[in-house]
């Protein structure tokens, strides 16, 4: 068995999903060229039709996985209706994938304020100027709004829009997947019945 296969296979013995996630994310940060914190976010509309898009993970802990968005956007509205979501991380350079399913909660006002102020000034202006997911007549309309808000907040702090905040996905299941030859991949699934539970059930899955 090669050293790489042996190293990749070691994860199958791990007992704590958040520790394993942290390890894989750290390794992806080194090997992945673009946005190692990018994740696919899946939601469903009121008819059950799924939507998926890429967003960026901005924080994680044993409480869950955090990203930020406009609550009036398509994804924001779909999450607010169901308060459920699924995430997928895929790191091609490592040939690894993580699937997460869980319930969603809003981050606190303090968390949202702190993160919003850490964003580049142009991004904060954009949060005010963009009516995310709404029809846009042409690019000029958006650029005009950007100019207006740039002038309005030319001096001093830019406040966080009331409709712009974050969500935390609190996982009920986390599955780790690692590529192996002949599609005989390694899969390790952690599940729990409630997000209040500290202990996880752990099982290996057939490829």
From Swiss-Prot:
Protein's pathway: Cofactor metabolism; pyridoxal 5'-phosphate salvage; pyridoxal 5'-phosphate from pyridoxamine 5'-phosphate: step 1/1; Cofactor metabolism; pyridoxal 5'-phosphate salvage; pyridoxal 5'-phosphate from pyridoxine 5'-phosphate: step 1/1
Catalytic activity entry: pyridoxamine 5'-phosphate + O2 + H2O = pyridoxal 5'-phosphate + H2O2 + NH4(+); pyridoxine 5'-phosphate + O2 = pyridoxal 5'-phosphate + H2O2
Name of the molecule in the record: Pyridoxine/pyridoxamine 5'-phosphate oxidase
Gene3D superfamilies tied to this protein: Electron Transport, Fmn-binding Protein, Chain A
InterPro entries per record: Pyridox_Oxase, Pyridox_Oxase_CS, Pyridox_Oxase_N, Pyridoxamine_oxidase_dimer_C, Split_barrel_FMN-bd
Family: Belongs to the pyridoxamine 5'-phosphate oxidase family.
Cofactor note as given: Binds 1 FMN per subunit.
One Gene Ontology molecular-function label: pyridoxamine phosphate oxidase activity
General function of this protein: Catalyzes the oxidation of either pyridoxine 5'-phosphate (PNP) or pyridoxamine 5'-phosphate (PMP) into pyridoxal 5'-phosphate (PLP).
Native source species: Bartonella quintana (strain Toulouse) (Rochalimaea quintana)
Keyword S-adenosyl-L-methionine: no
Residues the record lists as binding FMN: 53-58, 68-69, 75, 97, 132-133, 177, 187
Gene name linked to the record: pdxH
Entry cofactors: FMN
Keyword Oxidoreductase: yes
Ligand binding (substrate): 58, 115, 119, 123, 183-185
Any one Pfam family match given in the protein's UniProt record, by short name: PNP_phzG_C
Signal peptide location: none
Record text on subunit structure and interactions: Homodimer.
Enzyme Commission number: 1.4.3.5
Listed SUPFAM superfamilies: FMN-binding split barrel
HAMAP family xref list: PdxH
UniProt KW keywords: Flavoprotein, FMN, Oxidoreductase, Pyridoxine biosynthesis
Gene Ontology biological-process annotations: pyridoxine biosynthetic process
């Amino acid at each position: 068995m090669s050293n790489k296969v042996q190293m990749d296979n070691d994860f199958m013995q791990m007992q704590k999903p958040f520790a394993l996630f942290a390890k894989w994310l750290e390794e992806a940060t080194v090997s992945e060229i673009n946005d190692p914190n990018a994740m696919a976010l899946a939601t469903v509309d009121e008819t059950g039709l799924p939507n998926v898009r890429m967003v960026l993970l901005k924080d994680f802990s044993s409480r869950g996985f955090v990203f930020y968005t406009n609550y009036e956007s398509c994804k924001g509205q779909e999450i607010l209706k169901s308060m459920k979501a699924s995430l997928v991380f895929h790191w091609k350079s490592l040939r690894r994938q993580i699937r997460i399913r869980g319930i969603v909660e809003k981050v606190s006002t303090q968390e949202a304020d702190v993160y919003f102020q850490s964003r580049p000034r142009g991004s904060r202006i954009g949060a005010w100027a963009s009516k995310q997911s709404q029809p846009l007549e042409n690019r000029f309309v958006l650029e005009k709004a950007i100019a207006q808000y740039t002038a309005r907040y030319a001096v001093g702090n830019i406040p966080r829009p009331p409709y712009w905040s974050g969500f935390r996905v609190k996982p009920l299941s986390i599955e780790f997947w690692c590529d192996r030859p002949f599609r005989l991949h390694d899969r390790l699934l952690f599940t729990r019945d409630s997000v209040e539970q500290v202990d996880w059930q752990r099982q290996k899955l057939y490829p």
